[in-house]
A protein has these predicted regions:
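Extracellular and organelle-lumenal recognition/adhesion modules and their flexible linkers in secreted
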Residues: 1-183, 200, 214-222, 285-287, ...
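Conserved, mostly hydrophobic/aromatic
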Residues: 40, 136, 194, 230, ...
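Active-site mouth of glycoside hydrolases
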Residues: 73-76, 91, 152, 157, ...
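The substrate-binding groove and active-site-proximal loops of carbohydrate-active enzymes
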Residues: 112-122, 167-184, 206-221, 258-273, ...
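Aromatic/acidic polysaccharide-binding cleft in carbohydrate-active enzymes
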Residues: 148, 208-212, 335-442, 449-452
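Active-site neighborhood of glycoside hydrolase catalytic domains
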Residues: 226-229, 233-371
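Short, well-ordered beta-strand segments enriched in hydrophobic/aromatic residues
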Residues: 452-461
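C-terminal beta-sandwich/jelly-roll accessory domains of carbohydrate-active enzymes
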Residues: 461-544
Length: 544
């Protein structure tokens, strides 16, 4: 910025000085007594006296301030400066402001304000990352689908340009979704987040295709090498070429990386299969243990076109999604498993995240549970959305600079977070003239107290309540009469949604289940997801 006024002389600066400010993304949430790290690069050939402050959105209220001073030669070269600011009050719509009363030219670059209490100390908002962690995710697919490919290859995610010091990353235009990213959330940060969550990273790599372009198989070699280099960055020793870059970023031990997905929905494109085989052969030659995911369906996979997993994306109306509970029932039981890496209810009744959409997705997941011998894993898409910049609906978690809430489908996922590693049990449902219900049963162990539960989930997608008689065989006296509970996700209307004004309008409600036993009558509300968690004696199994 060029400052033409001064503290004295004929052109005196106004009270408080002149300068620039940045509100961040729709305002910064500054909390009382919390410490915020400010990082910036500065250059100037003039003497500098620069006030850096956190202020209210109108600039009238000062929350915290720090002054950068230096002689005429101190900042001739780019200089990195870091300091902390601590506010004495709360303000959910703040801005970062730079002001001075000294004439001269000041260059600023790579300016950042970050709270000191991020999730695991790695930069993610603690409240949002904790919501994700509460789901006990088993894998994290990144950096995305269309985001990884781009509308044009020049705007695709290039992992090598997203590692190293943040200020040295060039950033890129995410033309798939229409915004610029500085790539502060890069390859390293995704791997770190997966590690912090205890989840397996699933890296989606560009296969030489974008929405409008495609690299021929004869010219794919450099992109193949780039992916192999990326795996070395994640898994290589600290003295390898790319492993040393990771080590310099503070993670000398290799990351876990067991899954690589080749492309995103490009099976139909001219060169996909030829390019895929080049990626497959090169990755397996160096890392034979990595599971490679194909964008083609199971029918295309053969010894000459191998894959460890195949990717499935499901977007449908709520009624259609409910019917897909049986989607994998007739899938051949041999060969590679599916990874349903994207699924969501879309359309009019999806809204911004309705109850009925969540119930349809629950029914779909019940079907995946029943077919877990042919389905490896599944994830909803998208996961997060900033309410100020919605590009897609619905999403599981909505946030702004200071608030967040889970949509009904987020709370629905809590009913399935104990399914990984659980034992599945067959179920049979007999209801006359009513086809709007599906159910599943698993046994799972609470890791905190090692108690074992039989979890029976029932999805009622219809508009009438149902009384059920549950009969459990093969347990004997294994169900304890106390310690069981019933949890219900429902609301007064199927199109109900959560919001910042009513963040818990559609959330699970739990109650003790009195006198749980092998045979019991239960009531299931219309438009509901109900879970019966029955506390068991150790080492018992069942047929339901």
């Amino acid at each position: 910025m060029e400052v033409l006024c001064d503290s004295k002389g004929t052109n005196v600066c106004p009270s408080g000085g002149v300068g620039v400010y940045n509100p961040g993304y729709w305002g910064m949430n500054i909390e009382r007594r919390k410490s915020y790290k400010v990082s910036l690069h500065i250059r100037s050939s003039d003497a500098v006296s620069l006030s850096v402050s956190l202020r209210s959105s109108d600039g009238l209220q000062k929350l915290a301030c720090h002054t950068i001073t230096g002689g005429k030669k101190q900042f001739t070269n780019w200089t990195k400066i870091e300091f902390h600011l601590k506010s004495s009050i709360n303000n959910t719509n703040s801005r970062l402001q730079f002001t001075t009363t000294k004439t001269g030219v000041i260059w600023l670059d790579q300016v950042s304000v970050m709270p000191s209490d991020t999730y695991m100390g790695h930069g993610f908002r603690k409240d949002l990352a904790s919501m994700l962690a509460d789901l006990k995710p088993q894998f994290l697919k990144f950096p995305g689908g269309n985001y990884a490919m781009g509308n044009y290859l020049r705007n695709a995610f290039q992992w090598g340009e997203t590692v190293g010091p943040w200020e040295e990353r060039p950033g890129h235009f995410n033309d798939a979704w229409g915004y610029w990213t500085d790539d502060g959330l890069g390859f390293f940060e995704f791997l770190q987040l997966a590690e912090d969550l205890g989840a397996s990273p699933v890296w989606v790599v560009n296969d030489g295709a974008s929405a409008n372009e495609e690299v021929s198989t004869s010219r794919i070699a450099s992109l193949v090498k780039d992916v192999v280099d990326g795996i070395e960055f994640a898994r290589g020793g600290p003295k390898t070429t790319w492993g040393s870059v990771r080590a310099a970023m503070g993670h000398p031990q290799p990351f876990k990386l067991d899954y690589v997905a080749i492309g995103n929905q490009e099976c139909w494109m001219l060169y996909y299969r030829g390019n895929y085989q080049k990626f497959y052969s090169a990755i397996k030659a160096s890392y034979p243990d990595i599971n490679i995911v194909s964008s083609c369906d199971k029918s295309t996979i053969s010894p000459s076109n191998p894959a460890d997993l195949y990717d499935v994306h499901v977007y449908a109306s709520s009624a259609n999604m409910f019917s897909r509970s049986s989607m994998f029932d007739n899938t051949p039981r041999s060969g590679p498993k599916a990874i349903v890496s994207e699924y969501a209810v879309t359309g009019n009744d999806a809204g911004k995240g309705t109850l009925v959409a969540a119930l349809a997705e629950a029914a779909f997941l019940v079907g995946l549970e029943k077919n877990s011998d042919v389905v490896e894993m599944a994830s909803c898409a998208p996961l997060f959305v900033n309410d100020n910049d919605r590009r897609w609906s619905p999403d599981a978690i909505v946030f702004n600079s200071w608030q967040h809430y889970g949509c009904p489908n987020y709370w629905m996922l809590h009913f399935f977070k104990d399914s990984s590693g659980a034992t599945f049990h067959p179920t049979a449902m007999q209801i006359s003239n009513y086809d709007q219900m599906v159910a599943s049963a698993i046994t799972w162990q609470n890791p905190k107290d090692k108690s074992t539960y039989l979890k029976i989930k029932v999805v009622n997608f219809g508009n009438k309540g149902v009384d059920l008689n549950i009969t459990i065989t093969g347990l004997g006296n294994a169900i304890k009469s106390s310690g069981s509970k019933k949890t219900v996700l429902t609301s007064s209307a199927p199109l109900d949604e959560n919001s910042f004004q009513q963040p818990e309008k559609v959330t699970p409600v739990s109650s003790l289940l009195a006198d749980a036993k092998q045979q019991m009558g239960v009531s299931v509300s219309s438009y509901s997801l109900t879970s019966f968690d029955l506390l068991l004696e150790p080492s018992k199994h069942s047929t339901i």
